[in-house]
Regions:
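Active-site beta->alpha N-cap acidic-glycine motif
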Residues: 51-150, 156-169, 176-177, 272
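Alpha-helical scaffold elements lining the catalytic groove of polysaccharide deacetylases
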Residues: 65, 98, 147-172, 186-233, ...
Length: 297
């Protein structure tokens, strides 16, 4: 009986060893699998979508990143100031007839703006782009194909910007200004750093409204209400050139903002260390050589 008991005990011990051994191996395999997956996730840049929370009329919104966080990448979404200065920017994905009216309103009010264009826009509308430059506006880089750039590596990211730079230089005979706006508002810390390394300033925004839906264009009243309530000192304004409403109300919006005490400056003035000395150029009737004054530094 004692021999049998010892045999049973030995079997029990061996069984336990086998169970623990299998469990250990499985744990190691599962642990290794999780580790590899975690490494893959960690290696992939975290995609972010630029967003704003408008909480108080005529005050800066709560943004996804602080000005200090963005500053390390030469990126901006507004100017930290109490001065009633605005920076107008337009995203141009395609042309549907509203840009001439937008340019007319800007010219009437002597307002400098930045137009962020894509490859297709430049290919199909070279004369409009040349008019933008002739009237003193900045042409910014919105990428060539308007993809989600947030997950791109350096080579692919650089190619998207360089393709548009090359076409712009072929079309206009001048170098493109080094301002970048992330397509679709999607970005990562990684490509903010890549843009900085390529000499770009990334330009987000602090004032916008839903103006891009072609079948759901806001009424004049809806648009005016949002644009007048959301305006604040130092705002970078994002509007879409494809908006019929924007083309129709921009003259009135600029007038209202001026009546509220606002004036307008160029992105070049926002990022320059010397401040906004150049603003006086745009506030006079001297439009003889606006291209030179608005040329990239």
């Amino acid at each position: 009986d004692n021999g049998m008991d010892r045999m049973e005990q030995l079997k029990a011990v061996l069984s336990l060893c086998l169970i623990f051994g299998v469990a250990f191996c499985l744990g190691s395999v599962v642990g290794h699998t999780v580790s590899v997956r975690d490494q893959a996730v960690m290696a992939r840049p975290a995609q972010k979508d630029w967003g704003l929370s408008f909480q108080e009329d005529n005050k800066p919104p709560v943004a996804d990143e602080s000005m200090e966080q963005l500053a390390q990448y030469d990126a901006f979404y507004a100017e930290n100031t109490t001065e009633k200065v605005l920076y107008l920017t337009f995203d141009c994905g395609y042309e549907n007839g509203n840009t001439p009216a937008i340019l007319d309103a800007l010219k009437k009010h002597h307002v400098p703006a930045a137009f962020f264009i894509v490859g297709n826009y430049l290919e199909k509308n070279p004369d409009l782009v040349k008019r933008m430059r002739a009237e003193g506006h900045i042409i910014g880089n919105h990428s060539y194909h308007h993809p989600d750039m947030s997950q791109m590596g350096k080579e692919e990211f650089q190619k998207e910007l360089a393709q548009l730079e090359d076409l712009y230089e072929q079309t206009t005979g001048e170098k493109m200004a080094k301002f970048y706006r992330p397509p679709q508002g999607k970005y990562s810390d990684n490509n903010l750093q890549l843009a900085k390394e390529l000499g770009y300033r990334t330009i987000f925004w602090s004032l916008a409204y839903v103006d891009w839906k072609q079948e759901e264009q806001p009424t004049h009243e809806e648009a005016m209400s949002k644009l007048l309530k959301r305006v604040h000192p130092g705002a970078i304004v994002l509007l879409h050139n494809t908006s019929r409403t924007n083309g129709e109300i921009l003259d009135e919006v600029l007038t209202k903002w001026e009546e509220m005490g606002y004036h307008f400056a160029s992105l070049e003035e926002l990022v320059s260390s010397g401040g906004r000395e150049a603003r006086s150029f745009f506030l006079t009737d001297n439009q003889e050589n606006p291209v030179k004054s608005a040329a990239p530094t």
